[in-house]
């Protein structure tokens, strides 16, 4: 029995100097090595930070096929993910974060569901959100099964996204060809780049399905994380700017390319 699936895990890293990095990273990688079905490869897109490079070179990835890709330039989550997708050699892609964890059955479920539903081009996990102390904070992606949102149970649609925004791409499986055809994350869009991506995929008739099982654990608002900085850090975003980026996502998903959007005061 083949215990691998034709999927590349894309893991962007910008620094090993983040608080509790070693603990988070070990748990994240362990959540991959203990999968019932292993991914074909893990693509780590990292900066040239000396301590990070040294850490990765000495880390024991056990049974994983790891490809390390150097990202040159200012660290940027969207751009690093996009580079990882470009360098990936698999049919499927999964976006991962160093402080998150896959459930042990996730890739096994994706493999099974992809065989049962060959027309589906992306599978979303039910995400359990926790804080940095592992205290439960809620679920994400479960709304595709809500009768007041879902037109067809389990499927994410463009109309649904216009009515409800709480969906995320962390842990998802999506065909590489879909990203090649309709574009990756847009690095110029702050805060709502995930929302814009999902709007764009569904607008282009990409069939996206949530697998009704817990598939991913996500640390929500970890101190010093990207979205924590948007709310509390030096890059704090005002309520007016939040409205701007939500409005921008709803306008930009018609375009495949990143049009280098800049924040302006009026919406």
Predicted regions and their residues:
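Glycine-rich, basic loop-to-helix element that forms the pyrophosphate-binding segment
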Residues: 71-88
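Nucleotide-sugar-dependent glycosyltransferase catalytic core
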Residues: 136-140, 188-190, 203-207, 211-243
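Short, acidic, metal-binding catalytic loop of nucleotide-sugar glycosyltransferases
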Residues: 27-39
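Short aromatic/hydrophobic "clamp" motif used to bind/position activated sugar donors
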Residues: 93
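Conserved donor NDP-sugar-binding/catalytic core segment of glycosyltransferases
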Residues: 105-142
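Short, flexible, basic/aromatic active-site loop/helix in glycosyltransferases
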Residues: 141-164
């Amino acid at each position: 029995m083949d215990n691998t699936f034709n999927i590349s895990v894309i893991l962007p890293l910008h620094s090993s100097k983040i608080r509790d990095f070693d603990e988070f990273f070990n748990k994240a990688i362990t959540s991959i090595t203990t999968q019932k079905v292993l991914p074909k490869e893990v693509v780590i897109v990292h900066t040239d930070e000396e301590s990070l490079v040294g850490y990765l070179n000495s880390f024991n990835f056990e049974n994983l096929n790891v490809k390390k890709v150097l990202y040159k330039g200012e660290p940027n989550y969207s751009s690093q993910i996009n580079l990882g997708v470009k360098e990936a050699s698999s049919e499927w892609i999964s976006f991962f974060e160093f402080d998150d964890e896959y459930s042990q059955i996730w890739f096994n479920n994706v493999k099974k569901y992809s065989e049962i539903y060959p027309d589906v081009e992306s599978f979303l996990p039910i995400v359990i959100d926790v804080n940095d102390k592992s205290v439960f904070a809620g679920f994400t992606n479960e709304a595709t099964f809500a009768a007041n949102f879902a037109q067809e149970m389990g499927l994410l649609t463009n109309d649904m996204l216009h009515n409800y925004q709480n969906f995320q791409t962390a842990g998802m499986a999506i065909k590489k060809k879909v990203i090649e055809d309709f574009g990756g994350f847009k690095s110029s869009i702050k805060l709502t780049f995930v929302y814009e991506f999902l709007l764009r995929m569904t607008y282009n008739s990409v069939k996206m399905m949530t697998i009704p099982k817990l598939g991913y654990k996500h640390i929500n608002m970890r101190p010093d994380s990207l979205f924590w900085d948007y709310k509390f850090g030096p890059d704090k975003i005002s309520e007016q700017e939040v409205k701007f980026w939500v409005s921008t996502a709803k306008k930009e998903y018609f375009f495949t390319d990143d049009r280098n959007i800049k924040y302006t005061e009026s919406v």
